[in-house]
């Protein structure tokens, strides 16, 4: 898809709901395009965490990061709490992929797929998922993670289709900015804002927005 400006997904990866809301509001005020309700927040507080974060950030889109395999009912639960996107792990199961796409469409929520595969299988798995209707993907830039000499996952996604939306997650500042320059549609970061650090939040968001 290659958006004109790389979007920024701010991940709220804390356990405490009050702190999570504070971080989410800060990220919105600093210019984040998307707020991620992180896995720790959901696990600690249940699905209500999604709704509480959505109320706190208003019209800013919210992603529910379940980090589960495609499980029946997740789309309905996330949508009921106001999520706009949902992250799901996925492997080679065409029925579950097609079912997730349909359930998300029925509930007006966009599935973002995190392929669970060996690095050498990523290309084939993603190509199959695209053929089944998947449009949004999430992954680390490199495999092994953080190793630029390894497989460039972003390059694989971009080679498969210019139409898919690719989010790269990275808590390494230089890697995040380079991924934005290299064609990622969205960059997800979170470690820098585990505490409400407005200066760090602005630094990350502005650098990613200005990378292209």
Task: Name these PLM-found stretches.
Residues 1-64, 68-72, 128-130, 202:
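Conserved N-terminal beta1-alpha1 strand-loop-helix module at the mouth
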Residues 6-12, 35-37, 62-66, 86-88, ...:
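Hydrophobic faces of well-ordered beta-strands that scaffold small-molecule active sites
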Residues 14-19, 39-45, 68-71, 93-95, ...:
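Short, small-residue-enriched loops and turns at beta-alpha junctions
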Residues 21-25, 47-51, 75, 97-101, ...:
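Generic structural signal for well-ordered alpha-helices
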Residues 23, 69-81, 120-131, 166, ...:
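Catalytic cores of alpha/beta
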Residues 72-73, 77-163:
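Conserved anion-binding
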Residues 100-104, 180-181, 189-212:
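C-terminal helical cap(s) of enzyme catalytic domains, especially alpha/beta-barrels
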């Amino acid at each position: 898809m290659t958006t004109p400006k790389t979007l920024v997904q701010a991940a709220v990866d804390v356990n405490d709901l009050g702190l999570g809301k504070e971080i989410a509001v800060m990220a919105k005020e600093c210019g984040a395009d998307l707020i991620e309700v992180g896995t720790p927040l959901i696990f600690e507080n249940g699905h209500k965490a999604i709704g509480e974060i959505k109320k706190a950030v208003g019209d800013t889109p919210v992603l529910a990061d379940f980090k589960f395999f495609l499980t029946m009912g997740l789309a309905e639960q996330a949508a009921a709490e106001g999520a706009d996107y949902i992250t799901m792990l996925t492997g080679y199961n065409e029925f579950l992929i097609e079912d997730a796409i349909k359930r998300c469409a029925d509930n007006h929520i966009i599935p973002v797929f995190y392929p669970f595969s060996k690095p050498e299988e990523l290309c084939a798995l993603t190509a199959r998922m695209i053929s089944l209707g998947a449009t949004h993907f999430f992954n680390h830039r490199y495999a092994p993670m953080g190793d630029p000499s390894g497989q460039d996952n972003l390059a694989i996604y971009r080679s498969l289709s210019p139409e898919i939306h690719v989010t790269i997650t990275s808590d390494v500042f230089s890697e995040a900015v380079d991924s934005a320059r290299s064609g990622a549609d969205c960059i997800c970061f979170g470690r820098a804002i585990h505490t409400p650090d407005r200066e760090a939040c602005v630094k990350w968001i502005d650098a990613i927005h200005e990378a292209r």
